Amino acid sequence: MYEKIEGGSVIDIQGLKCNLPPEGYVFNIITKQVEFRGVYKRSEIQSEQYWKRIPLPSWYLDTMKKWDEFDKKKKDDEVEFYDEKLEEYKKQEWDRRLNGFWYMNNGEPTFLTGLHYLYLQWWPIDIGYPKFRIPDIEKFYFMEYCIQDPLCMGMLEVTKRRFGKSFVAGLFVSEYITRTKMTNGGIQSKTGSDAKKFFAKTVVNPFRRLPKFFRPEYDMSLGVNPKTEMRFQRQT
Protein backbone atom coordinates (compact mmCIF):
# COMPACT_ATOMS: atom_id res chain seq x y z
CA MET A 1 0.00 0.00 0.00
CA TYR A 2 2.82 2.41 0.81
CA GLU A 3 5.28 1.60 -1.99
CA LYS A 4 4.31 2.08 -5.62
CA ILE A 5 3.77 -1.15 -7.56
CA GLU A 6 4.55 -1.21 -11.26
CA GLY A 7 1.39 -1.75 -13.28
CA GLY A 8 -0.81 -1.26 -10.24
CA SER A 9 -3.41 1.37 -9.40
CA VAL A 10 -3.72 4.11 -6.78
CA ILE A 11 -6.73 4.90 -4.63
CA ASP A 12 -7.02 7.93 -2.35
CA ILE A 13 -8.26 7.08 1.15
CA GLN A 14 -8.55 10.12 3.42
CA GLY A 15 -5.53 11.71 1.74
CA LEU A 16 -3.34 8.61 1.65
CA LYS A 17 -2.36 7.40 -1.83
CA CYS A 18 -2.82 3.65 -1.38
CA ASN A 19 -1.07 1.50 -3.99
CA LEU A 20 -2.85 -1.64 -5.16
CA PRO A 21 -1.15 -4.41 -7.15
CA PRO A 22 -2.20 -5.10 -10.77
CA GLU A 23 -5.42 -7.06 -11.21
CA GLY A 24 -4.93 -10.67 -10.13
CA TYR A 25 -1.46 -10.02 -8.69
CA VAL A 26 -0.18 -9.72 -5.12
CA PHE A 27 3.06 -8.46 -3.64
CA ASN A 28 4.61 -11.48 -1.92
CA ILE A 29 6.14 -10.21 1.33
CA ILE A 30 8.42 -13.27 1.50
CA THR A 31 9.87 -13.27 -2.03
CA LYS A 32 9.51 -9.46 -2.38
CA GLN A 33 8.10 -10.05 -5.87
CA VAL A 34 4.80 -9.22 -7.58
CA GLU A 35 3.24 -12.60 -8.33
CA PHE A 36 0.10 -13.73 -10.16
CA ARG A 37 -2.68 -15.39 -8.16
CA GLY A 38 -5.75 -14.80 -10.32
CA VAL A 39 -9.19 -13.46 -9.40
CA TYR A 40 -11.58 -15.72 -7.49
CA LYS A 41 -15.19 -15.96 -8.75
CA ARG A 42 -17.97 -17.58 -6.78
CA SER A 43 -20.18 -17.39 -9.91
CA GLU A 44 -20.02 -16.46 -13.58
CA ILE A 45 -23.29 -14.53 -13.14
CA GLN A 46 -22.48 -10.92 -12.29
CA SER A 47 -25.36 -10.43 -9.86
CA GLU A 48 -24.11 -13.43 -7.86
CA GLN A 49 -20.55 -12.13 -7.64
CA TYR A 50 -20.23 -10.86 -4.10
CA TRP A 51 -18.31 -11.76 -0.99
CA LYS A 52 -19.45 -14.90 0.72
CA ARG A 53 -17.21 -16.94 2.97
CA ILE A 54 -15.41 -19.42 0.73
CA PRO A 55 -16.64 -22.97 1.44
CA LEU A 56 -14.22 -25.34 3.12
CA PRO A 57 -12.98 -28.30 1.03
CA SER A 58 -15.12 -31.43 1.33
CA TRP A 59 -12.30 -33.31 3.05
CA TYR A 60 -11.36 -30.51 5.47
CA LEU A 61 -13.31 -31.35 8.63
CA ASP A 62 -12.44 -35.04 8.50
CA THR A 63 -8.74 -34.32 8.00
CA MET A 64 -8.65 -31.75 10.81
CA LYS A 65 -10.27 -34.31 13.11
CA LYS A 66 -7.55 -36.83 12.19
CA TRP A 67 -4.92 -34.18 12.94
CA ASP A 68 -6.41 -33.57 16.40
CA GLU A 69 -6.52 -37.30 17.14
CA PHE A 70 -2.93 -37.70 15.96
CA ASP A 71 -1.69 -34.89 18.21
CA LYS A 72 -3.44 -36.33 21.26
CA LYS A 73 -1.39 -39.53 20.92
CA LYS A 74 1.84 -38.00 19.58
CA LYS A 75 5.00 -37.94 21.68
CA ASP A 76 7.31 -34.93 21.63
CA ASP A 77 10.00 -36.62 19.52
CA GLU A 78 7.61 -37.98 16.87
CA VAL A 79 7.10 -36.48 13.42
CA GLU A 80 4.28 -34.00 12.85
CA PHE A 81 0.98 -34.89 11.21
CA TYR A 82 1.11 -34.68 7.41
CA ASP A 83 -1.59 -34.71 4.76
CA GLU A 84 -0.74 -33.58 1.22
CA LYS A 85 -4.08 -31.90 0.50
CA LEU A 86 -4.03 -30.13 3.85
CA GLU A 87 -0.49 -28.87 3.25
CA GLU A 88 -1.54 -27.30 -0.05
CA TYR A 89 -4.57 -25.73 1.60
CA LYS A 90 -2.45 -24.36 4.45
CA LYS A 91 -0.03 -22.81 1.95
CA GLN A 92 -2.94 -21.22 0.08
CA GLU A 93 -4.51 -19.72 3.19
CA TRP A 94 -1.20 -18.46 4.58
CA ASP A 95 -0.46 -16.85 1.22
CA ARG A 96 -3.81 -15.07 1.29
CA ARG A 97 -3.33 -13.99 4.90
CA LEU A 98 0.12 -12.55 4.23
CA ASN A 99 -0.24 -11.18 0.70
CA GLY A 100 -3.90 -10.47 0.02
CA PHE A 101 -6.65 -11.84 -2.19
CA TRP A 102 -8.51 -10.83 -5.35
CA TYR A 103 -12.16 -11.70 -5.94
CA MET A 104 -14.87 -10.63 -8.35
CA ASN A 105 -17.46 -8.29 -6.81
CA ASN A 106 -20.42 -7.55 -9.12
CA GLY A 107 -18.15 -7.67 -12.16
CA GLU A 108 -15.38 -5.62 -10.52
CA PRO A 109 -12.06 -7.27 -9.55
CA THR A 110 -11.61 -6.32 -5.89
CA PHE A 111 -8.45 -6.57 -3.81
CA LEU A 112 -8.56 -7.48 -0.13
CA THR A 113 -5.50 -6.95 2.04
CA GLY A 114 -4.31 -10.06 3.84
CA LEU A 115 -5.67 -8.77 7.14
CA HIS A 116 -9.07 -8.06 5.58
CA TYR A 117 -9.19 -11.54 4.02
CA LEU A 118 -8.35 -13.11 7.39
CA TYR A 119 -11.12 -11.03 8.99
CA LEU A 120 -13.79 -12.05 6.48
CA GLN A 121 -12.83 -15.69 6.05
CA TRP A 122 -11.54 -16.80 9.45
CA TRP A 123 -12.23 -14.27 12.26
CA PRO A 124 -15.67 -14.94 13.82
CA ILE A 125 -17.51 -12.07 15.49
CA ASP A 126 -20.54 -11.99 17.78
CA ILE A 127 -23.05 -12.53 14.94
CA GLY A 128 -21.15 -15.12 12.89
CA TYR A 129 -18.59 -14.11 10.28
CA PRO A 130 -18.22 -10.49 9.09
CA LYS A 131 -19.85 -9.20 5.93
CA PHE A 132 -18.03 -7.29 3.21
CA ARG A 133 -18.57 -3.52 3.38
CA ILE A 134 -17.00 -0.74 1.31
CA PRO A 135 -16.06 1.34 4.41
CA ASP A 136 -14.19 -1.71 5.71
CA ILE A 137 -12.13 -2.19 2.56
CA GLU A 138 -11.12 1.48 2.70
CA LYS A 139 -10.26 1.11 6.38
CA PHE A 140 -8.06 -1.92 5.73
CA TYR A 141 -6.30 -0.14 2.85
CA PHE A 142 -5.66 2.85 5.10
CA MET A 143 -4.48 0.61 7.94
CA GLU A 144 -2.10 -1.34 5.68
CA TYR A 145 -0.59 1.92 4.42
CA CYS A 146 0.02 3.03 8.01
CA ILE A 147 1.63 -0.32 8.86
CA GLN A 148 4.01 -0.09 5.89
CA ASP A 149 4.88 3.61 6.24
CA PRO A 150 8.17 3.72 8.22
CA LEU A 151 7.39 7.25 9.44
CA CYS A 152 3.89 6.44 10.70
CA MET A 153 3.42 6.10 14.47
CA GLY A 154 -0.16 4.84 14.26
CA MET A 155 -3.66 5.88 13.23
CA LEU A 156 -6.78 7.24 14.91
CA GLU A 157 -10.29 6.05 14.08
CA VAL A 158 -13.47 7.93 14.89
CA THR A 159 -16.67 6.09 14.04
CA LYS A 160 -20.15 5.21 15.27
CA ARG A 161 -21.11 2.26 17.44
CA ARG A 162 -21.83 -1.23 16.08
CA PHE A 163 -19.51 -0.76 13.13
CA GLY A 164 -17.26 -3.72 13.90
CA LYS A 165 -14.27 -1.72 15.11
CA SER A 166 -13.81 -3.80 18.28
CA PHE A 167 -13.40 -7.09 16.41
CA VAL A 168 -11.12 -5.49 13.81
CA ALA A 169 -9.01 -4.15 16.69
CA GLY A 170 -8.93 -7.61 18.27
CA LEU A 171 -7.72 -9.07 14.99
CA PHE A 172 -5.18 -6.29 14.55
CA VAL A 173 -3.55 -6.93 17.92
CA SER A 174 -3.61 -10.71 17.34
CA GLU A 175 -2.54 -11.19 13.72
CA TYR A 176 1.06 -10.00 13.86
CA ILE A 177 1.95 -11.43 17.27
CA THR A 178 0.60 -14.89 16.36
CA ARG A 179 3.15 -15.19 13.55
CA THR A 180 6.13 -13.25 14.93
CA LYS A 181 8.56 -14.36 17.64
CA MET A 182 9.31 -12.22 20.71
CA THR A 183 6.43 -9.82 20.04
CA ASN A 184 3.89 -8.34 22.44
CA GLY A 185 0.47 -6.80 21.92
CA GLY A 186 -1.54 -4.77 24.39
CA ILE A 187 -5.06 -3.51 25.05
CA GLN A 188 -6.02 -0.26 26.75
CA SER A 189 -9.58 0.64 27.76
CA LYS A 190 -11.53 2.88 30.16
CA THR A 191 -10.95 0.47 33.05
CA GLY A 192 -9.13 -2.78 33.66
CA SER A 193 -12.47 -4.60 33.78
CA ASP A 194 -13.46 -3.23 30.36
CA ALA A 195 -10.10 -4.28 28.94
CA LYS A 196 -10.63 -7.84 30.22
CA LYS A 197 -14.09 -8.01 28.62
CA PHE A 198 -12.68 -6.71 25.34
CA PHE A 199 -9.84 -9.25 25.47
CA ALA A 200 -12.21 -12.16 26.09
CA LYS A 201 -14.72 -11.15 23.43
CA THR A 202 -12.55 -9.89 20.58
CA VAL A 203 -9.27 -11.76 21.03
CA VAL A 204 -9.61 -15.02 22.97
CA ASN A 205 -12.91 -16.23 21.53
CA PRO A 206 -12.09 -15.60 17.85
CA PHE A 207 -8.53 -16.89 18.32
CA ARG A 208 -9.74 -20.22 19.72
CA ARG A 209 -11.95 -20.69 16.66
CA LEU A 210 -9.16 -20.12 14.14
CA PRO A 211 -8.04 -23.17 12.17
CA LYS A 212 -5.23 -25.07 13.83
CA PHE A 213 -2.67 -24.02 11.22
CA PHE A 214 -3.21 -20.35 12.16
CA ARG A 215 -3.27 -20.92 15.92
CA PRO A 216 0.09 -21.16 17.71
CA GLU A 217 0.30 -23.15 20.91
CA TYR A 218 -0.33 -21.14 24.05
CA ASP A 219 0.29 -21.67 27.75
CA MET A 220 -2.76 -23.50 29.09
CA SER A 221 -1.74 -22.97 32.71
CA LEU A 222 -3.73 -19.72 32.53
CA GLY A 223 -6.81 -21.66 31.43
CA VAL A 224 -8.41 -22.51 28.11
CA ASN A 225 -9.98 -19.05 28.15
CA PRO A 226 -7.33 -16.83 29.75
CA LYS A 227 -8.62 -13.63 31.33
CA THR A 228 -5.66 -11.26 31.13
CA GLU A 229 -3.01 -12.58 28.73
CA MET A 230 -2.09 -15.29 26.24
CA ARG A 231 1.45 -16.65 26.24
CA PHE A 232 2.37 -18.26 22.96
CA GLN A 233 4.66 -20.94 24.29
CA ARG A 234 4.44 -24.60 25.11
CA GLN A 235 3.38 -25.43 28.62
CA THR A 236 6.21 -27.10 30.54
Regions of interest found by a model, annotated:
Residues 1-236:
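Phosphate/NTP-binding elements of NTP-utilizing enzymes
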